[in-house]
């Protein structure tokens, strides 16, 4: 029975929560612009889906009794082509899926291995069979039309199979018409256009139309019997008339929910959404010190794809239209020229500028600058005169602590030090807060048309045409009278080869004789008419294999005896021992070229299968090109100077020694010899402050002091004005072509189609193998008399099936698959050049 209608498809589970986006890392110092990064490698293609399970084949209907053979009539003239039946109503088409973008014509990939056959599903309810329609007469074959361009559509939506009709009675067989004269071949047409048809042969005489046999009664459903013995080939009868189309069968009950089918073709990405409004500007954050560029974070995983809406109801199946007679396929037209590249479309509108992001946390402090060069050492001053040692005074009490003076003026900014080398990458910063989802953007304008695809590969050579039918057997000639022996004359011309004689018993091989002189080549005889085919003989018992005889000498040609009756072919005996190689025989006349057989008719396309569920989402797209690097903002204003540190406390006062005893005044001594200058004594206790001396001259420049400690970080400065737009980056290189997707899994088998009309009889079979050589005749005179023509051989066995016809036309385009997932996040590109300060 017909297969049940496929049940509704189950809903897809809801999409999971998308992961929180990573927080923004600290801003690094902008390095020099690097070359644009290469496009990332394509992602691995997804695994093909599991093939669907095959449904259970419905029970086979009961076979009707064979009708009574009609009276054999003569072949009738070709009837008028019957009117085409009313086409059935077409089922409602479901909502179209997104159209897939057409790719370039790729080379034909290898056919993948067939998937495993799934377990059988429950059988569907059989529909009510419709009445048997009469077969219409075959119309005259029209001229071949020009071959249309080869379409490249997607797989069509399979239709629901209609009910299977009850086979009607076998029509009466008509007599075979006389073979028409083969027409002259038409002149060769221009390339791509069909050649003109040759003149049609004269039609055979009109025969009586065979009477239609009674309809067979529908038998009860029984087990399938063993195959019967193949009968002899019947004579084709006259074509019947087309019957009235039966009513549509009752709609079968909905079957269970079908198993998910194989993966569908990857759909093209959806249109870009409308750009969301500009987000609210957040509060101004504390600007951090320019940090170093952190390492690139791992690529985020693509979010889950949304689940599609519920599938619409399936339309009622349309009525099956009557099958029209297919015309002879025309010659294939020449391929058209490659189309020109389409004009480039206008650029899309510029998107709204996004809002300013939140300020990231402060980065680590920068490295300490390199100290400046040391100053030159000044000249050593002249030593001053030694002062008079003062008396020890009593130290005064410590004065009150002075007030803190006002802060000094900020020093002028020193010259910028050399640019330090790039430090190691800092640790990745914490992930930023999750941003609000933007509104779907408006669809962008269409991009420029792609260039023309590469010309497809040349198609494979077509199947060789079927072998033409064998001509009719001519009338058997009369037996000639036996002539008298004449005088021995010169060797005569070689006569035409006589018909093959019956296969005799295998004799013993004689010894090879000396080769005789080669006679002159005779003129080939005229081809005789083939006689009618005789009845098939019965197989005789197998003969025992004889022992190979000794190699005898070649004897003279004997008198040809009368041809015996054709014996029935016995079964093949066991293989004998191969005999010695015989001498090469004379070449036979060239064979006559056979007539080309009639072109077979293209069968009707089978019913469309049930639409499979949409395939899984496509693989992730390849990484996008590196975008232009924006310029950096201006440097913020410097912070206020740091506070001056407090003055340290004075150390403890030393202990004052006791005054010494005053000695007796000595006498005036005689000045002695000046001694050598002694070592400088220890520094005495500071005396009271002396009077302010005169101002000294300008001293030499002092030596540069050691670099002071870094001051504390100043307060954050205000945000600088937004910088000007940077120079657009270089246009990225064109990405590499993606790898071809995986070969799709084999689809689930469609429902059993309705039984088509009976095909044409096959071509006559190849001639049987050459019979074995008969025994050598008795030695006769040199010139033998003309032999009696042998009886015509039997017909060969049934020929092998003809070659496969051309493939049918492609079905209509199927619905596109669901939109693919978003591609993986690309790796950050190299840092661009620093922007120009305004």
From Swiss-Prot:
Tissue specificity: Forms the fibrils of tendon, ligaments and bones. In bones, the fibrils are mineralized with calcium hydroxyapatite.
Record field: compositional bias (Basic and acidic residues): 39-53
Key words of the record: Calcium, Collagen, Extracellular matrix, Hydroxylation, Repeat, Secreted
Residue spans of biased composition, Low complexity class: 11-38, 101-122, 137-147, 215-236, 329-344, 407-424, 436-446, 479-523, 530-550, 568-581, 593-602, 649-689, 703-718, 736-758, 766-781
PTM summary: Prolines at the third position of the tripeptide repeating unit (G-X-Y) are hydroxylated in some or all of the chains.
Entries under Pfam families matching the protein: Collagen (PF01391)
Keyword match Calcium: yes
GO cellular component terms given for this protein: collagen trimer; extracellular matrix; extracellular space
Compartment annotation: Secreted; Secreted, Extracellular space; Secreted, Extracellular space, Extracellular matrix
Region (Disordered): 1-838
Keyword set includes Repeat: yes
Major site of localization recorded for this protein: secreted
Gly residues bias locations: 351-360, 447-456, 582-591, 633-642, 693-702
Family under the similarity heading: Belongs to the fibrillar collagen family.
General function of this protein: Type I collagen is a member of group I collagen (fibrillar forming collagen).
Subunit composition and interactions: Trimers of one alpha 2(I) and two alpha 1(I) chains. Interacts (via C-terminus) with TMEM131 (via PapD-L domain); the interaction is direct and is involved in assembly and TRAPPIII ER-to-Golgi transport complex-dependent secretion of collagen.
Name the UniProt record assigns to this protein: Collagen alpha-2(I) chain
Species: Cyclopes didactylus
């Amino acid at each position: 029975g017909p297969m049940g209608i496929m049940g509704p498809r189950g809903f897809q589970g809801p999409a999971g929560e998308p992961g929180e986006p990573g927080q923004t890392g600290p801003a690094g110092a902008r390095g020099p612009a690097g070359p644009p990064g290469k496009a990332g490698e394509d992602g691995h293609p997804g695994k093909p889906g599991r093939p669907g399970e095959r449904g259970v084949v419905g029970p086979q209907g009961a076979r009707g009794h064979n009708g009574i053979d009609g009276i054999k009539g003569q072949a009738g003239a070709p009837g008028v082509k019957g009117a085409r039946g009313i086409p059935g109503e077409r089922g409602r088409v479901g909502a179209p899926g997104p159209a897939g973008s057409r790719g370039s014509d790729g080379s034909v990939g290898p056919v993948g291995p067939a998937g495993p056959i799934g377990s059988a599903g429950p059988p569907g309810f059989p529909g009510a069979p419709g009445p048997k329609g009469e077969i219409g007469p075959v119309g005259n074959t029209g001229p071949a039309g020009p071959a249309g361009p080869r379409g490249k559509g997607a797989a069509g939506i399979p239709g629901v199979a209609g009910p299977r009709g009850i086979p009607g009675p076998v029509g009466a067989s008509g007599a075979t018409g006389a073979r028409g004269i083969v027409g002259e071949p038409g002149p060769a047409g221009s390339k791509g256009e069909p050649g003109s048809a040759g003149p049609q042969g004269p039609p055979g005489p009109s025969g009586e139309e065979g009477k239609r046999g009674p309809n067979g009664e529908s038998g009860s459903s029984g087990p399938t019997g063993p195959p019967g013995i193949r009968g002899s080939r019947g004579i084709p009868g006259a074509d019947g008339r087309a019957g009235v189309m039966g009513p549509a069968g009752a709609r079968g009950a909905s079957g269970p929910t079908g198993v998910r089918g194989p993966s569908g073709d990857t759909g093209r990405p959806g249109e870009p959404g409308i750009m969301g409004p500009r987000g609210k500007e957040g509060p101004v954050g504390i600007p951090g010190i320019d940090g170093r560029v952190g390492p690139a974070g791992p690529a985020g995983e693509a979010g889950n794809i949304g689940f599609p809406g519920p599938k619409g109801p399936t339309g009622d199946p349309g009525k099956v239209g009557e099958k029209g007679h297919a015309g002879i396929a025309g010659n294939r037209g020449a391929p058209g020229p490659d189309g020109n590249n389409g004009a480039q479309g206008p650029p899309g509108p510029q998107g709204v500028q996004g809002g300013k992001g939140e300020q990231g946390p402060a980065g680590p402090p920068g490295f300490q600058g390199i100290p400046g060069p040391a100053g030159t050492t000044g000249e050593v001053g002249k030593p001053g005169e030694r002062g008079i040692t003062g008396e020890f005074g009593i130290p005064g009490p410590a004065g009150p602590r002075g007030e803190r003076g006002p802060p000094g003026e900020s020093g002028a900014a020193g010259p910028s030090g050399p640019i330090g080398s790039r430090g190691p990458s800092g640790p990745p910063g914490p992930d930023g807060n999750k941003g609000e989802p933007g509104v779907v953007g408006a669809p962008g304008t269409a991009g420029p048309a792609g260039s023309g695809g590469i010309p497809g590969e040349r198609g494979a050579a077509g199947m060789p045409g079927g072998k033409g039918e064998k001509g009719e057997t001519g009338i058997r000639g009369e037996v000639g009278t036996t002539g008298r022996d004449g005088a021995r004359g010169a060797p005569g011309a070689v006569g035409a080869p006589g018909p093959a004689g019956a296969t005799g018993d295998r004799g013993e091989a004689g010894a090879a004789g000396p080769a005789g002189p080669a006679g002159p080549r005779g003129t080939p005889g005229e081809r005789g008419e083939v006689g009618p085919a005789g009845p098939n003989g019965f197989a005789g018992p197998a003969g025992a294999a004889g022992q190979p005889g000794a190699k005898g000498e070649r004897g003279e040609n004997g008198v040809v005896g009368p041809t015996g009756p054709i014996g029935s072919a016995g079964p093949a005996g066991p293989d004998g021992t191969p005999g010695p190689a015989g001498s090469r025989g004379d070449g036979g006349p060239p064979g006559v070229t056979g007539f080309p057989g009639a072109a077979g008719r293209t069968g009707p396309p089978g019913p469309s299968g049930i639409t499979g569920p949409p395939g899984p989402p496509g693989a992730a797209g390849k990484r996008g090109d590196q975008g232009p690097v924006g310029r950096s903002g201006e440097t913020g204003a410097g912070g206020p100077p740091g506070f001056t540190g407090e003055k340290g406390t004075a150390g403890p006062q030393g202990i004052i020694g006791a005054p010494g005893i005053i000695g007796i005044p000595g006498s005036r001594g005689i000045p002695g010899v000046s001694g050598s200058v002694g070592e400088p004594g220890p520094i005495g206790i500071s005396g009271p402050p002396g009077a302010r001396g005169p101002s000294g001259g300008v001293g030499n420049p002092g030596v540069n002091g050691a670099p002071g400690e870094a001051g504390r970080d100043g307060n954050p400065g205000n945000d600088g004005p937004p910088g000007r737009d940077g120079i657009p980056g270089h246009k990225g290189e064109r990405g590499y072509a993606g790898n071809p997707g995986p070969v799709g899994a084999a689809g689930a088998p469609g429902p059993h189609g309705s039984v088509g009309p009976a095909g044409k009889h096959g071509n006559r079979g190849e001639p049987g193998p050459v019979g074995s050589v008969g025994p050598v005749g008795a030695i006769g005179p040199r010139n033998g008399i003309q032999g009696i023509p042998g009886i015509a051989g039997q017909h060969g066995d049934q020929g092998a099936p003809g070659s496969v016809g051309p493939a049918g036309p492609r079905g209509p385009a199927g619905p596109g698959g669901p939109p693919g997932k978003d591609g993986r996040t690309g790796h950050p590109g190299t840092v661009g050049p620093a922007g120009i300060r305004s």
